[in-house]
């Protein structure tokens, strides 16, 4: 996490804790000629536009006070979306019993992608039920875990 992302995380936490929101991720990156500071938040039952506005206004004021960014940027506060990658222990716990797709850095049995029911998360490993068989994956080899969205 960059220095700007760390500062943003520290600045936004009080309003998130006060409202029982969860910080999912902070991104600070350049796209084209513009810099973006993106803050992704969530809560039980989902984030509303009013929630995003509340956090955005609070964070904008705090960033203006501290002024950690010496050029113009666009601040975005939003929900991470349905198919967002699972990143936090809370994400994994919320998705226990649900179908997920796991992408690996190094192949296992010549495969880098596995889909199955998320049975367990311990912090350093996850266990999936894939095609009737339990499979264990070390988190250090896991590149990405995303929920499988069925319509």
Swiss-Prot record:
Gene3D superfamilies: Ribosome maturation factor RimP, C-terminal domain (2.30.30.180), RimP-like superfamily, N-terminal (3.30.300.70). GO terms for biological process: ribosomal small subunit assembly; translation. One of its GO terms (cellular component) is cytosol. It comes from the Bacteria. It is found in: Cytoplasm. InterPro entries: Ribosome_maturation_RimP (IPR003728), RimP_C (IPR028998), RimP_C_sf (IPR036847), RimP_N (IPR028989), RimP_N_sf (IPR035956). Keywords: Cytoplasm, Ribosome biogenesis. The keyword Transferase does not apply. Required for maturation of 30S ribosomal subunits. Belongs to the RimP family. This is Ribosome maturation factor RimP. The gene is rimP.
């Amino acid at each position: 996490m960059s220095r700007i992302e760390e500062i943003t995380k520290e600045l936004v936490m009080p309003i998130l804790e006060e409202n029982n929101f969860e910080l999912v991720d902070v991104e600070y990156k350049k796209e084209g000629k513009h810099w973006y500071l993106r803050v992704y938040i969530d809560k039980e039952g989902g984030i509303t536009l009013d929630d995003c506005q509340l956090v955005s206004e609070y964070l904008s004021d705090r960033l203006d006070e501290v002024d950690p960014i010496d050029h113009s940027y666009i601040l975005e506060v939003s929900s991470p979306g349905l198919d967002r990658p699972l990143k936090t222990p809370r994400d994994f716990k919320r998705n226990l019993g649900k179908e997920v797709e796991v992408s690996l850095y190094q192949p296992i049995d010549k495969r880098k992608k596995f889909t199955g029911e998320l049975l367990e998360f311990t912090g350093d490993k996850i266990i999936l039920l894939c095609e009737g068989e339990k499979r264990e994956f070390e988190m250090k080899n896991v590149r990405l875990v995303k929920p499988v969205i069925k319509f």
